UniProtKB/Swiss-Prot annotation:
Pathway: Carbohydrate degradation; pentose phosphate pathway; D-ribose 5-phosphate from D-ribulose 5-phosphate (non-oxidative stage): step 1/1. Its EC number is 5.3.1.6. It comes from Paraburkholderia phymatum (strain DSM 17167 / CIP 108236 / LMG 21445 / STM815). Homodimer. Coiled coil: none annotated. GO terms for biological process: D-ribose metabolic process; pentose-phosphate shunt, non-oxidative branch. One of its GO terms (molecular function) is ribose-5-phosphate isomerase activity. It catalyses: aldehydo-D-ribose 5-phosphate = D-ribulose 5-phosphate. This is Ribose-5-phosphate isomerase A. The keyword Signal does not apply. SUPFAM superfamilies: D-ribose-5-phosphate isomerase (RpiA), lid domain, NagB/RpiA/CoA transferase-like. HAMAP family: Rib_5P_isom_A. It comes from the Bacteria. Belongs to the ribose 5-phosphate isomerase family.
């Protein structure tokens, strides 16, 4: 199977999981990206079972609404039974790098409210040590250079994310992103807390303090379910 086919496979598996494990009439959290889009597309056939969704980005909101799935503001929701999202990398303990699509802050906010984080990914995203995928850091624009110096001091290579026309990429929150290359992240929880404490950082794309509870992993043999018991 191609990578796109694996994404569709786990997207359908996630929809099946939600249907089987989440009570009817509830609201679910939905992430951002190509794998999350496959989940949205698979969930659309069963949208009548749920009140709707909380979205992690403008793009996801548009995708949900295109299927007629109601989108709720997180401020109006007390809790979410599950948050479903992909990952750029995931280690064997359920810690992830996320933010390749630029929605890391809203993804982290929605995930923090959910009772369960269901990660959906293909097998290529599983790593022994996080860091081969550049680590996104969302920053307030005026802090970009200062944060870049801190990243360099850690041994990373900071690269400001730009659009196709060379302008700084802006998140849905109006901030910029520094993608950090060259890190070998052996202690993701500690690094997450450390970088998040820097003035000017909105959030870092490490999801370790609130990592995945389980992962539906697309492989050439089918979907593998991985549970992270220490979460």
């Amino acid at each position: 199977m191609t990578q796109d086919e694996l994404k569709q496979l786990v997207g359908q598996a996630a929809a099946d999981y939600v249907i089987a494990n989440v009570p009817e009439g509830t609201i679910i959290g939905v992430g951002t990206g190509s794998t999350a889009n496959c989940f949205i597309d698979a969930l659309a056939a069963h949208k009548a079972r749920f009140r709707g969704a909380v979205s992690s980005s403008v793009a996801t909101t548009a995708r949900l609404q295109s299927h007629g799935i109601p989108v709720f503001d997180l401020n109006d929701i007390e809790s979410l039974p599950v948050y479903v999202d992909g990952a750029d990398e995931i280690d064997h303990g359920g810690a992830m790098i996320k933010g390749g699509g630029g929605a890391l802050t809203r993804e982290k906010i929605v995930a923090s409210v959910a009772e369960k984080f269901l990660c959906i990914a293909d097998a290529s995203k599983v790593v022994d040590v996080l860091g081969q995928f550049p680590l996104p850091v969302e920053v307030v624009p005026m802090a970009r250079t200062a944060i870049g110096r801190r990243v360099t001091a850690l041994g990373g290579v900071p690269i400001v994310r730009v659009t196709k026309d060379g302008a700084p990429f802006l998140t849905d929150n109006g901030n910029e992103i520094i993608d950090v290359k060259g890190l070998r992240i052996t202690d993701p929880r500690t690094l997450e807390a450390h970088v998040n404490a820097w003035p000017g950082v909105v959030t870092v794309g490490l999801f370790a303090a609130r990592g995945a509870d389980l992962c539906l992993l697309g492989t050439q043999k089918g979907v593998e379910t991985i549970v992270y018991p220490n979460r």
